[in-house]
């Protein structure tokens, strides 16, 4: 299992705007570049379709992470909160092909016992997955966003994913799974807490 440090700028975000016309023009040029005719039947609408798909696939670029973790509850809970097997679909920034898998996200609330809704954790995973990504950074961004908003005593994030850039090109090893982890706070400093969380995550 690979551990990760904080990626640069993971706790800040500049909201961007999607340029539909520019994306369509770029896809049209790409079709020319591979020797296709973008005006032929079957491809005439492809630039617009791909642009719309990219807008959806990269929607995380256009959403402020702070808007996702905007609901807190004072539950005075001081034990582990763990959400397992959160499906994720992301796009490798090196080849712009998909990687997909699951995320396991856990945290121990801070001294104030503040927690967020379980659906908010899933939305946070989705937000960071919907960007051009590398798995290591994705894992750290999820962890750092929870640290920033919840001020918890500890955070652990484990992501398991298959990368199509390894399955359909290059070494062509379908089924290979990459596992990354990010630990913060108590899970980084206390081996027993980390082992307990990992046991719960890996238990089927």
From Swiss-Prot:
Pfam short name (any one): GTP_cyclohydroI
Keyword Heme part of the UniProt annotation: no
GO biological process, alphabetically ordered: one-carbon metabolic process; tetrahydrobiopterin biosynthetic process; tetrahydrofolate biosynthetic process
SUPFAM superfamilies from the UniProt entry: Tetrahydrobiopterin biosynthesis enzymes-like
Binding positions for Zn(2+) per the UniProt entry: 92, 95, 165
Pathway given in the UniProt record: Cofactor biosynthesis; 7,8-dihydroneopterin triphosphate biosynthesis; 7,8-dihydroneopterin triphosphate from GTP: step 1/1
Keywords (A to Z) from UniProt: Hydrolase, Metal-binding, One-carbon metabolism, Zinc
InterPro entries: GTP-CH-I_C/QueF, GTP-CH-I_N, GTP_CycHdrlase_I, GTP_CycHdrlase_I_CS, GTP_CycHdrlase_I_dom
EC number: 3.5.4.16
Residues annotated as transmembrane: none
GO CC term, one of those recorded: cytoplasm
GO molecular function: GTP binding; GTP cyclohydrolase I activity; zinc ion binding
Reaction equation(s) it catalyzes: GTP + H2O = 7,8-dihydroneopterin 3'-triphosphate + formate + H(+)
Keyword set includes Cell inner membrane: no
UniProt record similarity statement: Belongs to the GTP cyclohydrolase I family.
Subunit annotation: Homomer.
NCBIfam families registered for this protein in UniProt: folE, PRK09347.1-2, PRK09347.1-3
Protein name per Swiss-Prot or TrEMBL: GTP cyclohydrolase 1
Gene: folE
């Amino acid at each position: 299992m690979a551990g990760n440090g904080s990626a640069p700028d993971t706790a800040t975000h500049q909201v961007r705007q999607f340029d539909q016309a520019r994306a369509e023009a770029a896809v049209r040029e790409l079709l020319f570049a591979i020797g296709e005719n973008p005006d032929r039947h079957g491809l005439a609408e492809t630039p617009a379709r791909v642009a719309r798909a990219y807008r959806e696939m990269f929607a995380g670029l256009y959403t402020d992470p702070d808007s996702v973790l905007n609901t807190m509850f004072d539950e005075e809970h001081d034990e582990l909160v763990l959400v397992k097997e959160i499906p994720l679909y992301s796009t490798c920034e090196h080849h712009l092909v998909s990687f997909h898998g699951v995320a396991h996200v856990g945290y121990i609330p801070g001294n104030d016992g503040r927690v967020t809704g379980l659906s908010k954790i899933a939305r946070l995973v989705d937000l960071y997955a919907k960007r051009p990504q590398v798995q290591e950074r994705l894992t750290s961004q999820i962890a750092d966003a929870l640290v920033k908003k919840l001020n918890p005593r500890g955070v652990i994030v484990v992501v398991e994913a298959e990368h199509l850039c390894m399955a359909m090109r290059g070494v062509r090893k379908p089924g290979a799974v990459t596992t990354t982890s990010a630990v913060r706070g108590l899970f980084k400093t206390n081996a027993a807490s980390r082992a307990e969380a990992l046991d719960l995550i890996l238990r089927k």
